[in-house]
């Protein structure tokens, strides 16, 4: 008699995805972030569900309902802070996951990669709308500034912004619809993540060497389930250190001031995980140009497979490309720092140089280094 996990229609899907899945024998800890993203998503959906039970999406009561959650609801404070800092952990894992894909050439699985880019946009949209919900100063002004960017779209821009706002400014209608979207999007993300896995399992996982590993596979369980549990424990440790010791470390103090349309905060800035894109947006003096650069800062990942010139898939044996990769990481950290600074000299110039370098690495330097490394192979 066959094992139930191999015969039952539902159990069979789980078995082929997480138990008997053939996995390369040499994948490193950089391959842990996929499962960690799944865990982050589950944590966010669960904590978000409990927060939604007590939250009211009305401009008059939104701020006080969040205060009520923190002060009066049993363990409301910890649920709220796990949700807020869980978003930060989500983005840390997301950046590591994408970075791994760029470094080891996982982008050659184009279907999986493109679904991943779509997932990234969806997660960013969800996080942005979630940041608006507490209805603090930074929530209100962040929503005003970011939605206003759509007015740069020629001809339909102004109508589009007013349509999204549901009026002539960010108000009750905007908050209500943002709550509705923020609630539904994580379930769409879950569905996209399932499609992401479906495409990945069509090809099998990549590995650090970038070489096809069909002749050397091991079962996912117990080897990688144990490895994933170690990563999970470390994730929970870092998350709980944040939540219990410095829950407001990554937040903005201005968001503890109720939203006031008559008083603009001195520096309007998004959460830390959007600062790199915000710096790229601000580095271009033209509004439409800035919006295009903002979108392209993520969308540029879609053309990485097209600009892959090297004969080797992974960067493991490509020192020149490795230098460029770490230059890109340093550049992103610089952009993140610049995004949080006021718009004044020397930050404007640094931001512009960092933005030029960001696009140059992807569009020029990486493809050229691939060609040079191909030549070096013949020496």
Swiss-Prot record:
UniProt: heme b b566 binding residues: 97, 196
Organism: Genetta pardina (Pardine genet)
Record-stated family: Belongs to the cytochrome b family.
Molecular functions per Gene Ontology: metal ion binding; ubiquinol-cytochrome-c reductase activity
Swiss-Prot/TrEMBL cofactor(s): heme b
Gene3D superfamilies: Cytochrome Bc1 Complex, Chain C
Keywords, comma-separated and alphabetical: Electron transport, Heme, Iron, Membrane, Metal-binding, Mitochondrion, Mitochondrion inner membrane, Respiratory chain, Transmembrane, Transmembrane helix, Transport, Ubiquinone
Family matches, as InterPro entries: Cyt_b/b6_C, Cyt_b/b6_C_sf, Cyt_b/b6_N, Cytb/b6-like_sf, Cytochrome_b, Cytochrome_b_C_euk/bac, Cytochrome_b_N_euk/bac, Di-haem_cyt_TM
Annotated compartments: Mitochondrion inner membrane
GO cellular component: mitochondrial inner membrane; respiratory chain complex III
GO BP: mitochondrial electron transport, ubiquinol to cytochrome c
Disulfide bonds: none
Spans traversing the lipid bilayer: 33-53, 77-98, 113-133, 178-198, 226-246, 288-308, 320-340, 347-367
PROSITE patterns documented for this protein: CYTB_CTER (PS51003), CYTB_NTER (PS51002)
Cofactor remark: Binds 2 heme b groups non-covalently.
Remarks, miscellaneous: Heme 1 (or BL or b562) is low-potential and absorbs at about 562 nm, and heme 2 (or BH or b566) is high-potential and absorbs at about 566 nm.
Annotated positions binding heme b b562: 83, 182
Topology in the lipid bilayer: Multi-pass membrane protein
Predominant localisation class: mitochondrion
Subunit structure: The cytochrome bc1 complex contains 11 subunits: 3 respiratory subunits (MT-CYB, CYC1 and UQCRFS1), 2 core proteins (UQCRC1 and UQCRC2) and 6 low-molecular weight proteins (UQCRH/QCR6, UQCRB/QCR7, UQCRQ/QCR8, UQCR10/QCR9, UQCR11/QCR10 and a cleavage product of UQCRFS1). This cytochrome bc1 complex then forms a dimer.
Described purpose of this protein according to its UniProt entry: Component of the ubiquinol-cytochrome c reductase complex (complex III or cytochrome b-c1 complex) that is part of the mitochondrial respiratory chain. The b-c1 complex mediates electron transfer from ubiquinol to cytochrome c. Contributes to the generation of a proton gradient across the mitochondrial membrane that is then used for ATP synthesis.
List of residues binding a ubiquinone: 201
The keyword Phosphoprotein is annotated on this UniProt entry: no
Keyword Transmembrane: yes
CDD domains assigned to the protein according to its UniProt record, in alphabetical order: cytochrome_b_C, Cytochrome_b_N
Classification of source organism: Eukaryota, Metazoa, Chordata, Craniata, Vertebrata
Stated name of the protein: Cytochrome b
């Amino acid at each position: 008699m066959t094992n139930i996990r191999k015969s039952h229609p539902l159990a069979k899907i789980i078995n082929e995805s997480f138990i008997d899945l053939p996995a390369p024998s040499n994948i490193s800890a950089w391959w842990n972030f996929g499962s960690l993203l799944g865990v982050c998503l589950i944590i966010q959906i669960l904590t978000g569900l409990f927060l939604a039970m007590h939250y009211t999406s009305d401009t008059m009561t939104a701020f006080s309902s969040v205060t009520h959650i923190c002060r009066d609801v049993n363990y409301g404070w910890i649920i709220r802070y796990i949700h807020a800092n869980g978003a930060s952990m989500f983005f840390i894992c997301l950046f590591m996951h994408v970075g791994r894909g760029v470094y080891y050439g996982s982008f050659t699985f184009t279907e999986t990669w493109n679904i991943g880019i779509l997932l990234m946009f969806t997660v960013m949209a969800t996080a942005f709308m979630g940041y608006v919900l507490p209805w603090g100063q930074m929530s209100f002004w962040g929503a005003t500034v970011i939605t206003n960017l759509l007015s740069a779209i020629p001809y339909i821009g102004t109508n589009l912004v007013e349509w999204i706002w549901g009026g002539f400014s960010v108000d009750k209608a905007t908050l209500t619809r943002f709550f509705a979207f923020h609630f539904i999007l994580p379930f769409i993300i879950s569905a996209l993540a399932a499609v992401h896995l479906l495409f990945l399992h069509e090809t099998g996982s990549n590995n650090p060497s970038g070489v096809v590993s069909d002749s050397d596979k091991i079962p996912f369980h117990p080897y990688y389930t144990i490895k994933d549990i170690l990563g999970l424990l470390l994730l929970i440790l870092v998350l709980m250190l944040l939540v219990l010791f410095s829950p407001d470390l990554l937040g903005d103090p201005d968001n503890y001031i109720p939203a006031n349309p008559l008083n603009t905060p001195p520096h309007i800035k998004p959460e830390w995980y959007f600062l790199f894109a915000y710096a790229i947006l601000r580095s271009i003096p033209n509004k439409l140009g800035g919006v295009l650069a903002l979108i392209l800062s993520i969308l540029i990942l879609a053309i990485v497979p097209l600009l892959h010139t090297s004969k080797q898939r992974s960067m493991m044996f490509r020192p020149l490309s490795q230098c460029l990769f770490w230059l890109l990481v340093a550049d992103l950290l610089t952009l993140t720092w610049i995004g949080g600074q006021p718009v004044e000299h020397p930050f404007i110039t640094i931001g512009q140089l960092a933005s030029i370098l960001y696009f140059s690495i992807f569009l020029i330097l990486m493809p050229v280094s691939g060609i040079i490394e191909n030549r070096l192979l013949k020496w």
